[in-house]
Amino acid sequence: MTMAGGRRGLVAPQNTFLENIVRRSNDTNFVLGNAQIVDWPIVYSNDGFCKLSGYHRAEVMQKSSACSFMYGELTDKDTVEKVRQTFENYEMNSFEILMYKKNRTPVWFFVKIAPIRNEQDKVVLFLCTFSDITAFKQPIEDDSCKGWGKFARLTRALTSSRGVLQQLAPSVQKGENVHKHSRLAEVLQLGSDILPQYKQEAPKTPPHIILHYCVFKTTWDWIILILTFYTAILVPYNVSFKTRQNNVAWLVVDSIVDVIFLVDIVLNFHTTFVGPAGEVISDPKLIRMNYLKTWFVIDLLSCLPYDVINAFENVDEVSAFMGDPGKIGFADQIPPPLEGRESQGISSLFSSLKVVRLLRLGRVARKLDHYIEYGAAVLVLLVCVFGLAAHWMACIWYSIGDYEIFDEDTKTIRNNSWLYQLALDIGTPYQFNGSGSGKWEGGPSKNSVYISSLYFTMTSLTSVGFGNIAPSTDIEKIFAVAIMMIGSLLYATIFGNVTTIFQQMYANTNRYHEMLNSVRDFLKLYQVPKGLSERVMDYIVSTWSMSRGIDTEKVLQICPKDMRADICVHLNRKVFKEHPAFRLASDGCLRALAMEFQTVHCAPGDLIYHAGESVDSLCFVVSGSLEVIQDDEVVAILGKGDVFGDVFWKEATLAQSCANVRALTYCDLHVIKRDALQKVLEFYTAFSHSFSRNLILTYNLRKRIVFRKISDVKREEEERMKRKNEAPLILPPDHPVRRLFQRFRQQKEARLAAERGGRDLDDLDVEKGNALTDHTSANHSLVKASVVTVRESPATPVSFQAATTSTVSDHAKLHAPGSECLGPKAVSCDPAKRKGWARFKDACGKGEDWNKVSKAESMETLPERTKAPGEATLKKTDSCDSGITKSDLRLDNVGETRSPQDRSPILAEVKHSFYPIPEQTLQATVLEVKYELKEDIKALNAKMTSIEKQLSEILRILMSRGSAQSPQETGEISRPQSPESDRDIFGAS
């Protein structure tokens, strides 16, 4: 039984590009390439190309659409360049090129390249067709081939190129010398009609084709339904009561009805219908063939204009022997002439042929499934059928009475007829007019007779039978028996078992509508977007039309295990027959695999795999087409016979999908889970080897394709050219950026000058520098350790000036190996040259400046120290920063052997070689560093406490002296003119 969705068909938008190409290119070998990825990789190849080239589909996937993998030493380089230019310029072109098959056999191909556009008029694919023209390129006449060898070669060439010759034959005229190159290119030229767009679109109907579910056709069907009931009621009435023989008005009405039914026949030749798989058939040829095989003959017989044919007959003589048109008339006792009897017989024949119009009820039968899914409509139709049967039997009951009331032998009225008894009961008896017309007159009227007939048939069909109208003659009794038999059957079937009929006939319909209502309520409750809602509804309708509401799992559970396995093998027979991986499987192995397979139906737009999702299934495409999308680009198009997923039998881990797999059309997939497949392969070891060797995935979702988009390459090229053509940036001399760089350059030059001065001072201070030079040079190829030394004088109590001078000269005089005295914006290392505010600032800021020294600055002069190790030696003394420097040294040199020189400050400037040491020695070294670090931290805390006391003493002296001075002097002390002021504040005081 067809559901509402099945009656309408599957009308969701779908991408039928691949199906259109395959259907229109039955004898063409072609590949499809992505036009938006570098090298235009192949995303689909048909079976013809695989047979022609010798490659498997999985082997050519992701290779260049230019088929560079088929080039060889004899391939023309100029033609290859032209092919590349055609791809780059998105042009349509054709070439003749020599390529090589997989077995390296050279073959001449005629290649046609055509761009495919999407709904945005953007080229997204390339269609490349290949035709073997080797027979036309190789000369038949060859000196090496003579006699039968030449004939065999000619026969082989003609046989291999029979399809091309059949195309060329109609266009070749006798006596013409046709150029093979141009003629072949012209014949194999693809027109624009064979290049559909790559986009999703609703099913299109050709011109002059009407959709069977459109508003116009629905309205027309209702009109036909009403006229069909009109015909079913009036045709039996007119035939039985012999009315409208000469009534022109009714003749015109019946003729109009006949014309409408003839128009309906014409429309049926141009109306779509739903195919067995739920698809909408819009091909005009298929529509016509389907209608001619089904309802055409019946519709044609029911539409013949019998009234018009009967009107052209000579019925004037017949009317002279008929009674009053308003009453029931009978023939005169005088027999009519022979011509009148012949005319009356012909007229009665055509009047009886009107009954053929009842075949129009077939139109109701074919559309009955449109309405019987609703309970109220079914009840109304059943009541109408019962009433229509009573109407037909009433007409037959009157015809029997009209035939029985007149005795042909005695030319008298039979008083045992039910019409005679009815005439007596209602007071209108029959009378013979002997003086006038000489006919029988009187009797009941037409309306009274019809109502009485309908009353009798109704009481008989319902088995009531009041008995006021009863059969008297033998024919009437036989018909009464037939009425009672038919009535009992109709009554018991229609009225006695209505509930049972509904439960048995419409159980699936009720479940279907219950499911639809539940889905609609769910979508409405959670406010699912309209687009997604339509996809859900379309999927449910399409799935129901495919399964007809049958629960496959429930049916299989009823069957025993052996029978269930046989059914599963039958359901998956397409997968087992089409793929060579299952050819060596035993019956037991196939049955085990079939039990694990699942059939999945996908609607257009459904995502089978999302990027990043676990690939836990192996999918076989049985029907439909899908696309594989990676980074918003189509990298493969999968069709019937393709396999995608992951090679579970070779990988130990569960893979993540690197792309999205989306259905383009309605698809049927046969899916087997990873665990189930591995379980079967582990049990059937022999089959597992054959399976892993012969099963080739069309697309492996585990592997990610690395590609570059042409748009990205072009954008990078444009940016590079733009930077190349840009004018250089010219800054004026007084620009802030230029001034900033000049300042950095000056500071760097000053720092380098200070380094050179510091090295000269260090050479004078080091006592054993020259003695150690030779020892250091001897070991310069090994690992070196440099130690940062700091000078510091013993801490002694001094006065304010002495403390200040000592702090500037000793505490803040920190040296890095081979570097200058560190300080903010230091130009000279001699603190005696600074005055006033600058001297006080240096005294307070030296500790912070040492922490700001970066490791990169300390390592800048490392190559120079390596070349002249004796120039950068410094003395190691105790200071507040020595602990930190010492700890850094130890941590940097963890794992190296410590020598006595490392522990002695005197030999710190000597560079030593270090070698790997055992783990225990390393642990001892780390512990020693830890203890030394603790001691250094304690010394640092003591020194910080001493510094705080000195600072508090300085603040106390400043406050005491500030209170004795005037406000003008106080302001001068608190706000000096500049850091480099020559005025010595402390000296002035």
Curated annotation (Swiss-Prot):
Residues 151-162 are annotated as: Required for phosphatidylinositol bisphosphate binding. The modification Phosphoserine is found at residues 974, 978, 981. It catalyses: K(+)(in) = K(+)(out). Residues 857-905, 961-989 are annotated as: Disordered. Keywords: Calmodulin-binding, Cell membrane, Cell projection, Endosome, Glycoprotein, Ion channel, Ion transport, Lipid-binding, Membrane, Nucleus, Phosphoprotein, Postsynaptic cell membrane, Potassium, Potassium channel, Potassium transport, Synapse, Transmembrane, Transmembrane helix, Transport, Voltage-gated channel. Residues 449-470 dip into the membrane without crossing it. A motif (Selectivity filter) lies at residues 463-468. One of its GO terms (biological process) is cellular response to calcium ion. Glycans are attached at residues 415, 433. Changing residue 737 to S: Decreases affinity for CALM 230-fold. Residues 14-94 form the PAS domain. Residues 673-770 are annotated as: Calmodulin-binding. Channel activity is regulated via tyrosine phosphorylation/dephosphorylation by SRC and PTPN6. Residues 924-964 are annotated as: CAD (involved in subunit assembly). Residues 857-879, 887-901, 980-989 have a biased composition (Basic and acidic residues). Disulfide bonds: none annotated. One of its GO terms (cellular component) is postsynaptic density membrane. Residues 242-248, 310-345, 400-448, 471-477 are extracellular. Channel activity is inhibited by interaction with Ca(2+)-bound calmodulin. Interaction of a single pore-forming alpha subunit with a calmodulin chain is sufficient to promote channel closure. Channel activity is not regulated by cyclic nucleotides. Channel activity is inhibited by binding intracellular phosphatidylinositol-3,5-bisphosphate and phosphatidylinositol-4,5-bisphosphate (PIP2), but is not inhibited by phosphatidylinositol 4-phosphate. One of its GO terms (molecular function) is delayed rectifier potassium channel activity. Residues 699-701 are annotated as: Interaction with cyclic nucleotide-binding pocket. It is a multi-pass membrane protein. Belongs to the potassium channel family. H (Eag) (TC 1.A.1.20) subfamily. Kv10.1/KCNH1 sub-subfamily. The segment S4 is probably the voltage-sensor and is characterized by a series of positively charged amino acids at every third position. Conformational changes of voltage-sensor are driven by an electric field generated by a potassium gradient across the membrane. Pore-forming (alpha) subunit of a voltage-gated delayed rectifier potassium channel that mediates outward-rectifying potassium currents which, on depolarization, reaches a steady-state level and do not inactivate. The activation kinetics depend on the prepulse potential and external divalent cation concentration. With negative prepulses, the current activation is delayed and slowed down several fold, whereas more positive prepulses speed up activation. The time course of activation is biphasic with a fast and a slowly activating current component. This is Voltage-gated delayed rectifier potassium channel KCNH1. It comes from Mus musculus (Mouse). The lineage of its organism: Eukaryota, Metazoa, Chordata, Craniata, Vertebrata.
